A protein has these predicted regions:
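Conserved ABC transporter NBD signature motif
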Residues: 65-73, 82
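The feature captures the beta-strand-to-loop junction immediately N-terminal to the Walker
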Residues: 42-44
């Protein structure tokens, strides 16, 4: 699976609604992102990096063009399906009180656990594996709101490995 084409972008235009119509942020973006490769998105403030990431993760619709993830159009995914193939770590703080790191990472299993969200033994093993992968075992029982910014980012990384 290494170097498999994972995300393919064709003639993508990003933007958002504004006074007097749609504000175009970037247009005619073509790119291919392959699994197993590090991809870096660089640019000056205000050029549309965050808008592009929000569009790629379906938090906002594209103005034009196409996005395919694993050979399937982004618009053809249900929210539940998308949650199993896309993980996003945002820079904003999540303000969660009364939740441990283990419980938060466990929430990453929600696309797989059914309506009630009860974790099976296999789900709990997956949570523990994700925590171990990011090497945050020492944070497992800490309350999320007590974490430093760096610790919180590591927890969010473990969530996307679920």
């Amino acid at each position: 699976m290494m170097n498999q084409e994972t995300i393919h972008i064709r003639k993508l235009t990003t933007g958002y609604p504004g006074k007097g119509g749609t504000k175009i942020v970037a247009k005619d973006i073509d790119a291919t992102i392959r699994s197993g490769e590090l991809t870096c998105l660089l640019g000056a403030n205000g050029v549309g990096k965050s808008t592009l990431l929000r569009t790629l993760s379906a938090f906002q619709p594209p103005v034009g063009g196409e996005i395919e993830i694993m050979g399937k159009k982004l618009t053809d995914y249900t929210d539940k399906q998308l949650a199993t193939v896309i993980g996003v770590v945002l820079t904003e703080k999540c303000s969660l009180r009364n939740m441990t790191v283990e419980e938060l990472v466990g929430m990453g299993r929600s696309p797989y656990t059914g309506f009630w969200g009860n974790l099976s033994k296999e789900d709990k093993n997956t949570v523990n594996d994700a925590i171990a992968l990011v090497r945050i075992e020492d944070l497992k029982y800490r309350m999320v709101h007590t974490l430093s910014d760096g610790e919180r980012q590591k927890v969010m990384l473990s969530l996307i490995h679920i």
